[in-house]
Amino acid sequence: MIIKLEPINDNNIDAVLSLSVREDQPFVAPNDVSLRQADEANAEDPGTARPFAIYADDHLVGFCMFAFAPKARDPEDRYWLWRFMIDKSEQDKGYGQAALAEIIRYFRENGADRLYLSTEPENERGLHVYHKAGFRETGTISEDEAVLMRMLKGPNKTIKEFYGINVNERLRIKRKKGYGVSIAVFDGEDLDTYCAGSGRFGRDFPVNPDMLFQAGSVSKPMFALTLLRYVDKGLIDLDADISGVVPEFIKKGPVTFAALLSHTAGFNLHGFPGYRADHEPLSLEDVLNGKGNTPKLRRIRPYGKQHMYSGGGYTLAELTFTRLTGVTLREAFQKEVAETLGLKRTGFFQPLDEELASNAAFGGRLAEKEDPAHGYHYYPEHAAAGLWTTPKELVKIGRALSKSYREGGLLRKETARRMMTPVMDSYGLGIQNLRGDIGYHDGWNEGFLTTWMFSLREDLCVAVMFNRSTDELDWKQSYIAIDLFQTAEEDLAEKPGKGRLKALCGKYEHPDDAEICVDEVFMQDGKLYAKFLGDDGEFTSQLYPIGKKTFGRKGGFSKLTFGKDCVTYNDLSCKKL
C-alpha cells in the first residue's frame, strides 16, 4: 500500500467534498467546513493551513489538514494535525494507520519536532488509532477536546506542558494515584483546561475538568459577590451600621458590611480548620460563640484603623446577611450567581450533596486519616471557607467580574469598581486588587489549595486547584497561576519591536526617598530586563509587555510605565540618566 498526500486543488476538491464519515462518528467536522476554515486562516496568515487529499494506491480514501506556525513562541502552537478523516466506505482497511504514518513523516521532514492534535474524549475509536501511532494525552482539554502529542525527534516521551509550563514536575505529580491538579485558563479567545494526577490520593481516580474541589478562602469573594447583587437591588446598604442586627456579637457600633468585607473591622479568627464530614451540623451562632473548634469571636483591633484578615468577620457578615434577607448564603448564591451565570457545579455545599460527591476530590490524605468515604472537611463557615467549585466555573465567575468592572454586567459597573478598589493593603471588598489591574484571591482548606486571578483590563482569567496543602506547594501552585496569567497576558499584548525596546534601555536615577527603584533597563538574549535596587539589596527581573508603554515584571505583581526619558514603578518616577 502506497499512501500519498496531495494538496487540495481543482482536480480533487469535488471528490474530497463528497467524502464523509459514519453517522456514529459525529466528532469529525464536514470537509466543506474544514476547507472554509483553511481559507480564512490563510487569508489572515498565508501558509498556516495546509489541506490534503489522502490517496492509497492512487485511490482517494480520506482528507487531512495541517496547521503550520513554526515561529510561534509556544511549541504547542506550532504544528497541528488539524483535521483527519477516512471515508466511511474506506474504513477498517488499515488506511487510517498508514495515513498517520505518512502524516508524521511529512511533519518530520518539514522541521517539526513534535505534533499535536485534539479530539473529543469520547472518541474511543479515534483515540485507539492515535495511540497506536504514538500519540499520548498531554492532560490539556481545549474547547472540550483532549489534546494529544507525539514527539517526532528523539524519544517519543509525552511532555506534560500547559502553556509551556511543566505543571507535573513543578507540583511533583509523579503517579496517577498521587495528588491531583485541575487548571483552567481563558486567554481572551479559548478556554483551556489541564488535569493530572488523582483526585483521591492512593486511588485510581483521575482528575477531570468537572471534578469538584474545595476553594478555601476563595469563598470570601463569592460571598461578597452575592451580597453585592443585593446591594445593586437596593436591598442592602454597604455602609449602614449592622450592629443592631447581631447585637450579641457587636457590643459597640458602628460596624458595616464594607468594613467586614475589607477586613478592617478588627475581629479575630483568621481562619477555620473544618470538621470531619460526619460532624454534627453547627450553626453560625455556634461558631461565633466558640462552641466549635475555634475561639469565640471578639474585636481585638480598633475599628477601621488597620487591615487584619478575619474569617471570623466574614462569618459575622454571613450571619448578618441571613438575618437581613431571610435566606441562607447557599440559597442566595444559587439564585443570584449560579443561575445567572449557568454554573452547575459551584455552591456552598455544606455538607456536600451525595450526587455531587461522586466526582469530588478528597483533600490530601484525609480519607486515610479520618473518613475513607469522605476525604474532606465540613465547613459551617460558608462565607469564609465553604465553597465547592471547579476551575472552569471559577474562570466563568472571574470573567463576569472583569466584564462588570469594565462595562457592567453581573454587577453594576460602579459596584464592581468599588469591590475592586483597595481599602487597605490592596484588599477591596472580598478581593485583592494587585498591580491596579488584577483581581486576586487564593484559598487554603485542609488538603486543598486554590489560586484565582483575572484581569481588570481584558477578558483573561486563571484558576488552579490542587488537592494537597503544604507551605511549599502553596507558593508553587500560586506561581504556576502567575506564570500562566502572565503568559496569556503577554500573548494578548501588542509586541514592541527591538528598536523600541532598545530605546528603553539605560541607567535611571535613584530618588532619595525610594524604598525600591529601577536602577537599569537592559536587553539580554532579545528580552528586556530591569535591575532593581532596594533596602534589601538588588535583584533582576525579566519584563514583558502588557500595554503600549507598560511592562509587567515576570513572577511579580508590579508594572513599569515608560514615559519620555523616565520610568514609573510603584508610583515613583525615575529619570533616565
Predicted features by range, described:
Residues L117-L127, E143-E145:
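Conserved beta-strand-loop-alpha-helix junction that forms the acyl-donor binding cleft
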Residues R175-S182, G202-L260, R299-G312, H382-A385, ...:
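Short active-site loop at a secondary-structure junction
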Residues R200, G253-E446, T450-T451:
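Short, surface-exposed loop or secondary-structure junction motifs
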Residues P155-G197, V327, E331-K335, E339, ...:
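Catalytic loop of the DD-peptidase/beta-lactamase superfamily, centered on the K-T-G motif
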Residues D92-R105, H128-K132:
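Conserved acetyl-CoA-binding loop-helix of GNAT-fold acetyltransferases
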